[in-house]
Curated annotation (Swiss-Prot):
Entry protein name: N-acetylneuraminate epimerase
Primary enzyme class: isomerase
Main location: periplasm
Pfam families in alphabetical order: NANM
Gene3D superfamilies associated with the record: Kelch-type beta propeller
Length: 388
């Protein structure tokens, strides 16, 4: 078993995962992750937080939020292929992992989007593969447990298109056939958002019956890798995310699940950073409740992609440098404001609700490195500070 001793002091209550409710109060050392984790997945059951997959491969770690001095403890390895971007949520005392993307076998020529589902049982510290397939590709989707024991899932890449594109790309030697390679990339990346056929249903999985259903259609463009915060029982805020590869949206939507259906409401967009810098939107941002507000921090985008899309150039990020953002926004239920900055640009990590702020865990930095650090964004409704 692997536990981490090195830790950071956080004079806060112990955090809950951003998409979970509740918090554990304590005054303890908060340990960094055992390894850097980006593009992974996380969930919480009671006082136990679980994080893994992504850049950690099949590794899976747990932290007792009532006793964080024990550090992150290695749990049973994930039994499926190493996967990025899986949708993960807890229900009925177990953790469910859906889809994601990666190579089906180590010698596979190209990655695919998986249509598999797995369950982790903390009691036996074991994984099992479920006898089901996801109805659509769910890589990049967000999953959240509902009060009735089911799991709702938002967004997700189209498996058929994604698999074919990566197989075609993998079959071309871009050094020997640069024109053919460029033509293929331009063709795929130059499509309008609707052409990618991302999942536009709010899917629901019922662990008790091992079956799938729908809570209705998303009336907006479906997106992947949005930031997500739980606002209350059955209420979820989805912020920004991709609407096609390389192009984000600044939109935010409130989803209320009532009487077996998802009801959508558009709320204020993320604000411009300045008069000269329009809001590009972000993918892979951190989000959670901080007091009465929602904080959204970091994420990644391509500066100039919105202008290209507005001009009809749908390969919107062509030639643009990827930017890992350090901006932090606060939402009071009506309006957004720029709250402050992260210590560095970060995206694709995990976020934990904590009394007084938002705990930022791992992620990817501007060099593409997976980070281990954990720090608290403290927010009192007026001023943002960083506590290491």
């Amino acid at each position: 078993m692997f536990s981490l001793i090195r830790a950071k002091r956080l004079a806060i209550g112990i955090a809950a995962l951003a998409w979970s409710t509740g918090a554990v109060m304590a005054s303890e050392h908060w340990p960094d992750l055992p390894v850097g984790i980006k593009n992974g997945a996380a969930a919480r059951i009671g006082n136990m937080a679980y994080v893994g997959l992504g850049s950690a491969g099949t590794d899976f770690y747990a932290l007792d939020l009532n006793n964080p001095s024990k550090g992150w403890v290695k749990r049973a390895n994930f039994i499926g292929p190493a996967t990025n971007g899986a949708a993960m949520a807890a229900a009925g005392g177990k953790i469910f992992a859906f889809s994601g993307n990666g190579k089906a076998t180590p010698d596979a020529k190209s990655p695919i989007i998986f249509d598999t589902a797995y369950v982790y049982d903390p009691g036996s510290d074991g994984w099992s593969k479920l006898d089901t397939q996801t109805p659509v590709g769910l890589s990049g989707a967000k999953a959240v447990g509902l009060a009735d024991g089911r799991i709702a899932i938002f967004g997700g890449y189209n498996k058929e298109l994604f698999d074919k594109y990566l197989a075609d790309v993998g079959a071309i030697d871009k050094d020997k056939e640069p024109e053919a390679y460029r033509k293929l990339v331009d063709s795929y990346m130059g499509m309008k958002p609707e052409a990618y056929r991302w999942n536009d249903e709010v899917l629901v999985y019922d662990p008790a019956g091992n079956n799938w259903g729908s809570l209705g259609a998303n009336p907006f463009l479906p997106n992947c890798d949005p930031a997500m915060a739980t606002m209350g029982e059955g209420d979820f805020l989805l912020v920004s995310g991709e609407i096609k590869p390389g192009l984000r949206t600044p939109e935010a939507k409130l989803v209320k699940i009532r009487d077996g259906a998802a009801h959508w409401q558009k709320v204020s967009d993320l604000p411009p950073l300045s008069g000269s810098e329009p809001q590009e939107g972000v993918a892979g941002a951190y989000a959670g409740k901080a007091g009465d507000d929602v904080l959204v921090a970091g994420g990644a985008n391509f500066k100039g992609a919105q202008a290209n899309a507005a001009a009809g150039k749908w390969f919107a990020h062509d030639g643009l440098a990827k930017s890992w953002r350090d901006d932090v926004y606060a939402f009071d239920g009506k309006d957004w404001k720029v709250a402050g900055k992260l210590p560095r640009g970060l995206a694709y990590g995990a976020a934990f609700d904590a009394p007084g702020g938002l705990l930022v865990v791992g992620g990817e930095d501007r060099d593409g490195k997976a980070r281990k650090e954990v720090f608290l964004l403290k927010w009192d409704g007026k001023a943002l500070s960083v506590e290491n």
